[in-house]
Regions:
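Conserved C-terminal beta-signal and adjacent last beta-strands/turns
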Residues: 159, 372-375, 562, 655-656, ...
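Structural signature of Gram-negative outer-membrane beta-barrels, strongest in the C-terminal barrel
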Residues: 376, 473-477, 502-617, 651-652, ...
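Short acidic/polar hinge/loop motifs at secondary-structure boundaries
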Residues: 260-287
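Short strand-turn segments of transmembrane beta-barrel domains in outer membranes
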Residues: 302, 307-336, 348, 353-360
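Gram-negative outer-membrane beta-barrel transporters
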Residues: 521-524, 613-617, 633-701, 739
Length: 764
């Protein structure tokens, strides 16, 4: 129901209804859409979830007749609420009113008045039927009269208008915030956004979000080195790439949590171990540059983690305990509450693994809390905080072992946001603060002496973000925003013997940016989008970033989209001031992305497929010039490729999906496979739920230096399943790499062969 409510508010919908994973959206005011659906497909209504902006007694009567399962209403009348509760239908609402007003706000709604004294839905139905018939008779007569005067033009226009209002089948994942800042139907956006929902995340039984993204998002890849954990510094995994853009460390791909940037203030890259499954309601991955809305680092795309929330008045508590191969333990506790205007989410986790190699242990613990309060209709105050600490060990490459390479990392984040949302406007003013404390022993190789000092750092990033989106006129949406970021930190080396500190770098920088995005629907067949951002960096200066695109809404639930966008990345403090080959004169990296995509839904929304073609051309990339022994802006990127996705819900029991990406890189980089294919199937019946998937990776570069160039090819087969022991307890198990493939993702770090994990989920 939470996603259904989000969909209701994402566009100009009056009502949305979900049944058997298929969603109908409606735009007509009043009860005409509900009446038509009850006439044409009453079976769809049975047991359905409904989210409606206004529910009066007549609408409630149609819902009772259709035997819907649950209802949410922004506004509901007292008679409607009583009727639904009398029929034992679960109801949640934002505001209860004595009666529904007419459109002029001068008195009762005619149907509300006509049904007010009627006791049964059997009495109300003929009243509703006759009322709608009378309204339509008047419209038909007016249309015929006008057609006689204008030669039939009015009749054609009326027919087109009615066609545009026909309920369309959509899926819940089509409502996104990443491409526009505000909630939007993805069909109106020219960019491509992949959505991984909570159900997909939970079926993985993984503490980290990155493995499920690697499976489900074409063109996205994450490096790995073992059962659990990614680490930092020497030998670290967790490098992310999208369409061959990202880097190692990942500076060309931006990670967000609820739209706020997440990266280490000194190094400028995300910390992979901080992005845990317990945080996410869903993850939205924008494939392609998103610098207009999010600025630096969003060159290759954006991974936006949308945190969990509670929409309905209920208390949910969950406990997950699991154990598996190589001393692996994963635990999680969560509690979600909604009571009146107050809501909260609190989660905690502890995870550990010995690893499949000696000296490869990993341990992590942390917690997350989010509080929200509805100040008034359309206004909400929300704040959250997340702290995680982990200890990671790196054994080095198998042919060159490393000893005592241990890291102790603590990361934290907090934010406070004031949000507003109405039918025509939405926006937010938010403050965010991220910080980190790193302690690293770089270790030593065989024959070397142990390190005499330890690397230490403190970093922070804080900022203010404001945006406001408004509908100025029909089919229009204008979004304007301002971002401010302050980031940096300090580093030092601390002697083991004496405790003496040798200063490293102590730098702080600022960014200011303003942006505007304009979207206009032209009729029912075209959406036009254009945006621009002006970004000022306190060291490198000003960058101008444009983007534009078209989305054609074609017959038979198909969409054709074209997009041109610019991405950029400012140099990091590490690249300019830390460690040789630093260079303070570096300039921003830049690229242009050209993209064409087509998608279609068929068989009543049960079948979906989409294809993307793209070309990326960039220059000024920061690379190390060995002859000069410093970083310079001499690198280039020229990538092109294709991506495809497909999903088919065969019946309520079986669901299959697949995605494929092909990438050609003129200048190959590590951690970006040339081909990646995933094929999966989900089975759900009775107490059983089982999912399986096969992933094929080819042309994965693990080394691209002049002295050494290596690639990997492998096939992974994974199976996961759960059994509902009783209403509150589920047993789960998973097996990964069941073909026992021998392969490497990080050069010199062989991955484990077949591994197994099992455990229990308790919900109450």
């Amino acid at each position: 129901m939470e996603r259904l409510i989000d969909l209701l508010h994402s566009g100009e919908y009056s009502c949305v209804m979900m049944s058997r994973k298929t969603v109908y959206t409606f735009v007509q005011r009043g009860v005409a859409d509900l009446y038509d659906l009850y006439q044409s497909d009453p079976g769809f209504m049975k047991g359905a979830s409904v989210a409606d902006k206004v529910v009066g007694k007549a609408a409630a009567a149609l819902m009772v007749l259709g035997k819907v399962g649950e209802v949410y209403a922004d506004v509901i009348s007292t008679p409607a609420l009583a009727l639904l509760r009398e029929a034992h239908i679960d109801v949640a609402f934002r505001q209860e009113v004595p009666f529904i007003e007419n459109r002029e706000k001068s008195g009762w709604c005619p149907l509300e008045s006509a049904c007010y004294r009627l006791k049964s839905v059997a009495e109300m139905y003929p009243v509703i039927r006759d009322f709608i018939a009378g309204i339509r008779m008047k419209k038909t007569f007016a249309g015929v009269l006008l057609a006689c005067v204008l030669g039939g033009t009015a009749v054609q226009a009326k027919a087109q208008s009615d066609t545009a209002r026909i309920a369309r089948n959509v899926v819940m994942d089509e409502v996104v915030v990443t491409g526009t800042r505000h909630e939007t139907d993805i069909r109106h956006l020219p960019m491509t956004v992949s959505v991984v929902n909570r159900s997909q995340i939970e079926k993985r039984y993984e503490p980290s979000l990155l493995p499920v993204l690697t499976e489900q998002v074409p063109g996205f890849f994450t490096t790995s080195r073992g059962m659990m954990g990614y680490g930092v510094s020497t030998g670290a995994a967790g490098g992310m790439s999208l369409r061959g853009v990202g880097g190692s460390p990942t500076t060309g791909l931006l990670v967000l949590i609820d739209g706020h940037p997440q990266y280490m203030g000194l190094m400028g890259h995300p910390i992979a171990d901080a992005y845990q499954s317990m945080l996410a309601e869903r993850v939205e991955v924008l494939r392609g540059p998103a610098s207009v809305l999010y600025g630096s680092n969003a060159m290759g795309g954006v991974v936006n983690i949308v945190t969990r929330k509670q929409q309905e008045d209920v208390v949910n508590t969950g406990v997950q305990l699991g154990a598996g191969s190589y001393g692996t333990l994963q635990t999680e506790v969560s509690n979600r509450v909604k009571k009146g205007r107050f809501s909260s989410v609190v989660t905690g986790s502890y995870n550990r693994s010995d690893g499949h190699r000696a000296d490869m242990g990993f341990e992590q613990y942390g917690g997350y809390a989010k509080l929200g309060y509805d100040l008034a209709e359309g206004w909400k105050l929300a704040g959250d905080a997340n702290v995680t600490h982990y200890n990671a060990s790196n054994p080095g490459e198998v042919d060159e072992p490393r000893f005592d390479n241990d890291s102790r990392i603590t990361r934290g984040m907090a934010s406070l946001a004031l949000e507003n949302r109405s039918d025509r406007m939405s926006g937010a003013l938010s403050f965010f603060y991220n910080w980190g404390r790193h302690r690293i022993n770089d270790g030593y190789l065989a024959g070397e002496e142990p390190q005499k000092s330890r690397f230490n750092s403190k970093d922070r990033m804080l900022g203010v973000s404001w945006f406001q989106s408004a509908v100025l006129f029909s089919g229009n949406r204008l979004t304007a925003g301002f971002d401010y970021q302050h980031f940096g930190g300090e580093s030092w080396n601390k002697a083991v013997a004496t405790g003496e500190q040798q200063p490293g770098v102590d730098k702080r920088m600022n960014e200011f940016a303003g942006y505007v995005d304009f979207r206009q629907d032209i009729g029912s067949w075209l959406s036009l989008d254009a945006g621009v951002r002006v970004d000022y960096h306190s060291h490198v200066g000003t960058e101008f970033i444009p983007q534009g695109g078209l989305a054609f809404h074609l017959p038979r639930n198909s969409e054709l989209k074209a997009m041109v966008s610019k991405g950029f990345r400012n140099p990091t403090i590490r690249e300019m001031y830390m460690f040789p080959p630093q260079n303070p004169d570096l300039r921003p990296e830049r690229l242009m992305n050209y993209e064409l995509s087509f998608s279609q839904r068929m068989l009543g929304g049960a079948l979906y497929y989409g294809v993307n073609l793209y070309y990326i051309d960039g220059d000024n990339l920061i690379v190390t010039d060995r002859s000069l022994r410093k970083n310079v802006n001499s690198g280039t990127v020229e990538n092109w490729g294709a991506e495809a996705v497909a999903a088919y819900r065969i019946n309520p029991v079986w669901h299959v999906s697949a995605n494929y990406s092909w990438l050609h890189m003129r200048h190959p980089v590590v951690a970006a496979p040339e081909q990646k294919l995933f094929v999966g199937a989900d089975f759900t019946q009775g107490r059983w739920s089982v999912s399986t998937g096969v992933q094929y990776v080819k042309g994965l570069y693990t080394a691209v230096s002049p002295e050494r160039e290596t690639t990997e090819e492998f096939v992974l087969w994974n199976v996961r399943g759960c059994f509902r022991l009783c209403p509150h307890v589920r047993l789960f198990a998973k097996g990964e790499n069941l073909l026992a493939q021998r392969y490497e993702i990080n050069a010199g770090y062989p991955m484990p062969k077949a591994t197994f994990t099992g455990g229990v989920n308790i919900h109450f």
